[in-house]
C-alpha cells in the first residue's frame, strides 16, 4: 500500500482502545475488504470493522471469510452467532489470522439475522450474550466487544439497558461496548427503517457511560460530521460512524488530525485514488471485477466540483470488459478540470 501520510501519534502497536476513539461501523455488503483497504488510505488510525460474518460461514463455508490485507490494521472482525462454542472457535481462528478485536453483533434487527438467533434479538437474553462473550474471552487475548442497541421492542427502559450491561460486563467480563443510540423493533420495521424511525437518544447513552465509568463505551447512530463526533467525545470514549463514512468517505481524511491529534496533513483524495492503483491491478489479475472495488469510492469527492461527473463516469464504465485503472484516471480528470 502506498502510504499517503504518516501519523506521528500512531502507537507502536495496535491499541483498539485508542483507535476506537473513531471507528467505521460494520455494514453488510459495504465494509468488505476492498472498502476497508480504501478507507485505510484516508485515515491511518480509524478502527475499521468487517461486515458481520456468521459463525456458520466461517466454520462450514467454502470461502475464506476471514481474508483481509495487512494494511487494514487496526481491523476488527464482527461475528454473528449465539453458540458460545462456535463463537469461541471463530474467535480463535480470527486471532490467529491477526485481527485486532472480536465484536459480537447484538444490534442487527433483520428477520434473517433473528432466524439465525443472533443480532438484536439477543438483547432479550443477556445471560446468553454473557456466555458468548466469556467463551470468546477465555480463548483469545485480543479484546472482545459487544455492539448493541438501547433496547428492543417494549423492553426499552433504562433499567433494562443497565441490567443488560451489568450482566454482560459482569458475568461475561466484557469491558467494551458500542451502543447504537436507538432501540430496535424486531418486527414491523425493515433494517433500513430501524436505522431511521426509532428516535435517537444520545442522552441515554451518555448516562450509561456515567453510570458505568469503568467500561469503555462508544456511541453510534446518526453521526454525520467530525464536529458532531467531537461533541460526542466530550461524553464518550469513542464514536462509531456508519453510513456517512461510506457515502461521504472524504470525511475520514481529517480524522487523524481532528480526532487523533496528528500533525500530518490530511489525505488528498486524488492521491488516495492513485494509491489504490497497485491494489486494483493486483485484484484485477486475480479475477476481481473493477466494479466490485470502485463502488466503494463513488462518494469520495462529495461536495467537490466534479463529483457528479466522477460518479457517473465510473458507474457507466467500470463494468465494461477490460475496465482497468485507466477508467479511474479518466474519471479523475473530470474532477481535476473542475478544481
From Swiss-Prot:
Its EC number is 1.3.1.-, 1.3.1.91. The record marks 105, 192, 195, 308, 311 as: Interacts with tRNA. The active site is at 108 (proton donor). This is tRNA-dihydrouridine(20/20a) synthase. CDD domains: DUS_like_FMN. It comes from Shigella flexneri. It is an enzyme of class 1 (oxidoreductase). Belongs to the Dus family. DusA subfamily. Its cofactor is FMN. FMN binds at residues 26-28, 78, 147, 180, 220-222, 242-243. Coiled coil: none annotated. SUPFAM superfamilies: FMN-linked oxidoreductases (SSF51395). Keywords: Flavoprotein, FMN, NADP, Oxidoreductase, RNA-binding, tRNA processing, tRNA-binding. PROSITE patterns: UPF0034. The lineage of its organism: Bacteria, Pseudomonadati, Pseudomonadota, Gammaproteobacteria, Enterobacterales. It catalyses: 5,6-dihydrouridine(20) in tRNA + NADP(+) = uridine(20) in tRNA + NADPH + H(+); 5,6-dihydrouridine(20) in tRNA + NAD(+) = uridine(20) in tRNA + NADH + H(+); 5,6-dihydrouridine(20a) in tRNA + NADP(+) = uridine(20a) in tRNA + NADPH + H(+); 5,6-dihydrouridine(20a) in tRNA + NAD(+) = uridine(20a) in tRNA + NADH + H(+). Catalyzes the synthesis of 5,6-dihydrouridine (D), a modified base found in the D-loop of most tRNAs, via the reduction of the C5-C6 double bond in target uridines. Specifically modifies U20 and U20a in tRNAs. NCBIfam families: PRK11815.1, yjbN. One of its GO terms (molecular function) is tRNA binding.
Amino acid at each position: 500500500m502506498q502510504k499517503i501520510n504518516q501519523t506521528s501519534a500512531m502507537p507502536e502497536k495496535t491499541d483498539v482502545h485508542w483507535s476506537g476513539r473513531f471507528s467505521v461501523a460494520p455494514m453488510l455488503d459495504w465494509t468488505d475488504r476492498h472498502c476497508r483497504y480504501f478507507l485505510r488510505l484516508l485515515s491511518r488510525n480509524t478502527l475499521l470493522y468487517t461486515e458481520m460474518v456468521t459463525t456458520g460461514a466461517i466454520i462450514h463455508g467454502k470461502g475464506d471469510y476471514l481474508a483481509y490485507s495487512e494494511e487494514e490494521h487496526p481491523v476488527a472482525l464482527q461475528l454473528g452467532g449465539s453458540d458460545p462454542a462456535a463463537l469461541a472457535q471463530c474467535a480463535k481462528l480470527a486471532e490467529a489470522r491477526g485481527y485486532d478485536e472480536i465484536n459480537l453483533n447484538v444490534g442487527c434487527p433483520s428477520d434473517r439475522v433473528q432466524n439465525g438467533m443472533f443480532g438484536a434479538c439477543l438483547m432479550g437474553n443477556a445471560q446468553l450474550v454473557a456466555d458468548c462473550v466469556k467463551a470468546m474471552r477465555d480463548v483469545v487475548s485480543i479484546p472482545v466487544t459487544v455492539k448493541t442497541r438501547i433496547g428492543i421492542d417494549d423492553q426499552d427502559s433504562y433499567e433494562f439497558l443497565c441490567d443488560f450491561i451489568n450482566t454482560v460486563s459482569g458475568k461475561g467480563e466484557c469491558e467494551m461496548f458500542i451502543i447504537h443510540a436507538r432501540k430496535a423493533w424486531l418486527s414491523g420495521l425493515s433494517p433500513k427503517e430501524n436505522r431511521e424511525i426509532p428516535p435517537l437518544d444520545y442522552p441515554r447513552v451518555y448516562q450509561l457511560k456515567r453510570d458505568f465509568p469503568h467500561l469503555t463505551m462508544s456511541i453510534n447512530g446518526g453521526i454525520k460530521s467530525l464536529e458532531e463526533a467531537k461533541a460526542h467525545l466530550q461524553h464518550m470514549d469513542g464514536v462509531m460512524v456508519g453510513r456517512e463514512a461510506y457515502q461521504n468517505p472524504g470525511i475520514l481524511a481529517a480524522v487523524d488530525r481532528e480526532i487523533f491529534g496528528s500533525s500530518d496533513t490530511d489525505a488528498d483524495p486524488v492521491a488516495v485514488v492513485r494509491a489504490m492503483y497497485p491494489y486494483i491491478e493486483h485484484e484485477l489479475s486475480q479475477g476481481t471485477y473493477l466494479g466490485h472495488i470502485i463502488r466503494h469510492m463513488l462518494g469520495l469527492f462529495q461536495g467537490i466540483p466534479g463529483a457528479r461527473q466522477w460518479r457517473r463516469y465510473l458507474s457507466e464504465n467500470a463494468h465494461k470488459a477490460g475496465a482497468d485503472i485507466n477508467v479511474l484516471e479518466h474519471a479523475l480528470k473530470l474532477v481535476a478540470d473542475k478544481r
